[in-house]
Amino acid sequence: MKQYLDLMKKVLEEGTPKADRTGTGTRSIFGHQMRFNLQDGFPLVTTKKCHLRSIIHELLWFLNGDTNVAYLHENKVSIWDEWADENGDLGPVYGKQWRSWGAADGRQIDQLKNVLTQLRQDPDSRRIIVSAWNVGELDKMALAPCHAFFQFYVADGKLSCQLYQRSCDIFLGLPFNIASYALLVHMVAQQCDLDVGDFVWTGGDTHLYNNHLEQTQLQLSREPRALPKLVIKRRPDTLFDYRFEDFEIEGYDPHPTIKAPVAI
């Protein structure tokens, strides 16, 4: 994951000081891309320990179309708590948009089911896309989508995916985002009888919060270790039937956790 450390270093050295919604302040660059060949290992940051339970359960929660934190709480995941209301609701965030996008004519569009159909029936299509950026519902969301738009691509029997992330918290958020979408590519590839290709991450406003700079320097002082391997132990009937127990990460040997505050 040297690419990730290189991005941190670039933002520290070249980033523009900017104000932000949270009032914390950032160093920011605009426009950056990283490519991860998923055949080379699972792209999970090794220079600090990442909370795998949160990454996996959050993705399963998205795939279920859920937008209430109750499921996350049942599985000891608290990463969305700061934005939930008193009932645990977040409004029409990722799960709602992925599984039940509200069309102008009243239809509810399951974008992920459409993606699976396209990959099986027309894998050369340039329209195999999921968007979470529903302009008509942004004001109802507890947090506007950061990872907003992703596209699948098939070549030589391999499935690749590119994500556009309009806003990226490099220290806390990005390791989760990379691992989450890499996991999704593996799951979709299994369901569509494809091998995995590349995960391409593209960032818009890509930033380090000012209260993460000390932690960033600590992380940059550490040497990356070998990437782990993802093992999917079962092939369920559909993309929406995976369970936490279906996944195993082999050979993950990270440096210790580095704690940092969340900018809300």
From Swiss-Prot:
(6R)-5,10-methylene-5,6,7,8-tetrahydrofolate binds at H51, D169, A263. It is found in: Cytoplasm. The active site is at C146 (nucleophile). Homodimer. Pfam families: Thymidylat_synt. Its main location: cytoplasm. It comes from Pectobacterium carotovorum subsp. carotovorum (strain PC1). This is Thymidylate synthase. One of its GO terms (cellular component) is cytosol. Its EC number is 2.1.1.45. Catalyzes the reductive methylation of 2'-deoxyuridine-5'-monophosphate (dUMP) to 2'-deoxythymidine-5'-monophosphate (dTMP) while utilizing 5,10-methylenetetrahydrofolate (mTHF) as the methyl donor and reductant in the reaction, yielding dihydrofolate (DHF) as a by-product. This enzymatic reaction provides an intracellular de novo source of dTMP, an essential precursor for DNA biosynthesis. DUMP binds at R21, R126, R127, R166, S167, C168, D169, N177, H207, L208, Y209. It catalyses: dUMP + (6R)-5,10-methylene-5,6,7,8-tetrahydrofolate = 7,8-dihydrofolate + dTMP. CDD domains: TS_Pyrimidine_HMase. It comes from the Bacteria.
